[in-house]
Amino acid sequence: MSSVKPLVYAVIRFLREQSQMDAYTSDEQESLEVAIQCLETVFKISPEDTHLAVSQPLTEMFTNSVCKNDIRPLSNSVPEDVGKADQLKDEGNNHMKEENYAAAVDCYTQAIELDPNNAVYYCNRAAAQSKLSHYTDAIKDCEKAIAIDSKYSKAYGRMGLALTAMNKFEEAVTSYQKALDLDPENDSYKSNLKIAEQKLREVSSPTGTGLTFDMASLINNPAFITMAASLMQNPQVQQLMSGMMTNAIGGPAAGVGGLTDLSSLIQAGQQFAQQIQQQNPELIEQLRNHIRSRSFSSSTEEHS
């Protein structure tokens, strides 16, 4: 029984710390004290037995054990396995180029089974999982890669992509910032960080529209209303609209003149856009930013 006393002492220490927290009611604290007394009685341990104390608190030992649970010791990998694993990684990379993402996942998984301490394999599998929209699995693989190599910037970058796809923009920003800390000159991380930051601002805004371009502000803008009214009073626009209505109810077709009418509408629309640009340029800039943000890329980086 003496061999387990350090463990029991650590448990008692943990329970005593918990009993002193305000998070518990008086009855719950009393129950913790009873548990402590029972353990001390059964294992014949007292608070004075400080020689039984270990260097790490019980919670820290538990956390470290959980983090390392999925990673087998490096000694399990032999040179032959490492070489075969690298070949499987290359096969997986080829499948990625061919957009055969399921096959790529299979190759990377086999590589991990042979060499479970290679961060690159987890990170590459994360990229394939993201392509399959398996974002939760992609994040888990990135976390495993980071657990092996905490300075692996690509793992943080790919985690940011998966988090962004899941609309977890705040976490994505953190991942991209960490990636940039490790690789400050990476343009892909810079670009994706800006996109994630923009998305975060959108979902945090009072309107909650999720759009960079505020259509409500445009419609309610007095300058826009005035310009829209001016456009509708344009004789060319009125003539074209009249012709369209006539055709819609079965009137004579516009014939060759339809091209001229369409050209007139385009010209009137261009004039309208120029007026908005001159009188309210910030709305045009919002629209441009919205269009740019829609072109969010899932990264074009090469695989390791």
Swiss-Prot record:
Record PTM N6-acetyllysine, positions in chain: K131
Any GO BP annotation: protein homooligomerization
Repeat positions for TPR: 15-49, 85-118, 120-152, 153-186
Database matches in Gene3D superfamilies: Immunoglobulin FC, subunit C (1.20.5.420), Tetratricopeptide repeat domain (1.25.40.10)
UniProt GO MF annotations: Hsp70 protein binding; identical protein binding; molecular adaptor activity; protein-folding chaperone binding
Function, in words: Co-chaperone that binds directly to HSC70 and HSP70 and regulates their ATPase activity.
Quaternary context: Homooligomerize.
Protein name: Small glutamine-rich tetratricopeptide repeat-containing protein beta
Organism of derivation: Rattus norvegicus (Rat)
Upper lineage: Eukaryota, Metazoa, Chordata, Craniata, Vertebrata
Gene that this sequence comes from: Sgtb
